[in-house]
Amino acid sequence: MYSFFVLASLLGGALASPVLGLRECTRGSAVWCQNVKTAADCGAVQHCLQTVWSKPTVKSLPCDICKDVITAAGNLLKDNATEQEILMYLERTCDWLPKPNMSASCKEIVDSYLPVILDMIKGQMSHPGEVCSALNLCESLQKHLAELNHQKQLESNQIPELDMAEVVAPFMANIPFLLYPQDGSHSKPQPKKANGNVCQDCIQLVTDVQEALRTNSTFVEALVDHAKEECDRLGPGMSDMCKNYINQYSEVAIQMVMHMQPKEICVLAGFCDEVKEMPMKTLVPAEVVSENVIPALGLVEPIKKDPAPAKADIYCEVCEFVVKEVAKLIDNNRTEEEILHALDKVCSKLPTSLAEQCQEVVDTYGSSILSILLDEASPELVCSMLHLCSSRGLPAATVRVMPRKDGGFCEVCKKLVGYLDRNLEKNSTKEQILAALEKGCSFLPDQYRKQCDQFVTEYEPVLIEILVEVMDPSFVCLKIGACPAAHKPLLGAEKCVWGPSYWCQNMESAALCNAVEHCRRHVWN
């Protein structure tokens, strides 16, 4: 039953392209061999079987299911089963599809192309994979590797596995049918969507099933036994194959049911409408929102409020996990853009119960975590800097020591001003800059802190005055004398002291005053 369900579902999508005209058929194998429908319309079925569909394929569950179904269908033909009997099996499977338009499309395809499919089965009984490639249920290995080639270098010749979550989803979608078999007429109307009570009934049913799975071990056995009884409805041959798949995948399906939301399962089953917009996150107190939205507040005293210990510990653990993942990506020489893109998938490695908190940390602090680590900060200190972990009991920081450059305070000046530039908002007041300066040195690696404190003590007055106007590290440190001047003197230096109103009036002035980066980040954006 499951095999035919998956086969019919994928068949409907694979063969849903429009009928080709004569003009399209002149374009060669790339058009002919898309699927059974295009090959039949262009009279190229045998050509595609011999030259395209016989190539190696990616190992995947849909491909394996298809091969078993085609083999079983071939055995039924050997046993003198009629085409009408096979058609009946496929049409019955089409009736199980959750949406009326999918069911109708599935039946139309089966009715129109059954002779072609049966001819292929008869001629390729020893090679069912070729038939499955024609049905687009087995993917070409060459095509798959070509798509991966632009993302990463192929490291081995092992055939890649596909995502198990995608292929097991149809099994979970059929759970309500297993508990309450649908034996009525195929022409009965489909259940109403979420605007009636059916959606809520489905959610309640799945909720009860999940609760029973958690608390009653015998319920799991009864559920699996009931599913195997349903296999007997398929008749000889198919029944054994159906039970074999239940033995292999029932445990995986049950685990996924346990970790999915009831509404998600009911959407897959077609009893609830899919929600198009993104779900709203849980609202949090206003002061926590402001602290999360502006990472710069990491430099200010935290609000005197004792958060719930359990919640604080969770965010601390999640932050430490994200920091470790980012550190691994940095060690692998990934670019900043690649790291930020990879962060979107980091939370999928955590249990579902932590995924929401993880996504909050990534969305709010992802860029700050990356910036702090790129400034050579110790990974153990990052979450404390962001006030997500307590600083008590931290181990001695192990930092990657960077070679110092000539120029006195030049290196530490650039690091400090660069950190302030990333974390202070535009038009910050002198008081905000002073507060940030007083604490800024504690955010730098150990080897820079002592020198940073000395630098702030010596340059604080002039530093605050210029930081009110500009925070470009190279310009500021050169202007206050912390970094040595270039070999060629700056042209037009008198005009450059006029500030951003002169620097950013055009690209020529910005380049003349070494303020291009400042203008891009603070004025021209």
Curated annotation (Swiss-Prot):
Main location: other
Known glycosylation sites: N80, N101, N216, N333, N427
Signal peptide range: 1-16
Pfam families registered for this protein in UniProt: SapA, SapB_1, SapB_2
GO terms, biological process: adenylate cyclase-inhibiting G protein-coupled receptor signaling pathway; epithelial cell differentiation involved in prostate gland development; lysosomal transport; prostate gland growth; regulation of lipid metabolic process; sphingolipid metabolic process
Alphabetically ordered keywords of this record: Cleavage on pair of basic residues, Disulfide bond, Glycoprotein, Lipid metabolism, Lysosome, Repeat, Secreted, Signal, Sphingolipid metabolism
Entry GO CC: extracellular region; extracellular space; late endosome; lysosome; membrane
Keyword Disulfide bond recorded: yes
Keyword Repeat: yes
Domain Saposin A-type: 18-58, 489-525
Prosegment location in residue numbers: 17-59, 143-195, 276-311, 392-405, 488-525
Disulfide bonds: C63-C138, C66-C132, C94-C106, C199-C272, C202-C266, C231-C242, C316-C389, C319-C383, C347-C358, C410-C483, C413-C477, C441-C452
UniProt modification remark: The lysosomal precursor is proteolytically processed to 4 small peptides, which are similar to each other and are sphingolipid hydrolase activator proteins.
Positions of the Saposin B-type domain: 59-142, 195-276, 312-393, 406-487
Subunit structure of this chain's protein: Saposin-B is a homodimer. Prosaposin exists as a roughly half-half mixture of monomers and disulfide-linked dimers. Monomeric prosaposin interacts (via C-terminus) with sortilin/SORT1, the interaction is required for targeting to lysosomes. Interacts with GRN; facilitates lysosomal delivery of progranulin from the extracellular space and the biosynthetic pathway.
PANTHER family: PROSAPOSIN, SAPOSIN-RELATED
Descriptive protein name: Prosaposin
Organism of derivation: Bos taurus (Bovine)
Recorded name of the encoding gene: PSAP
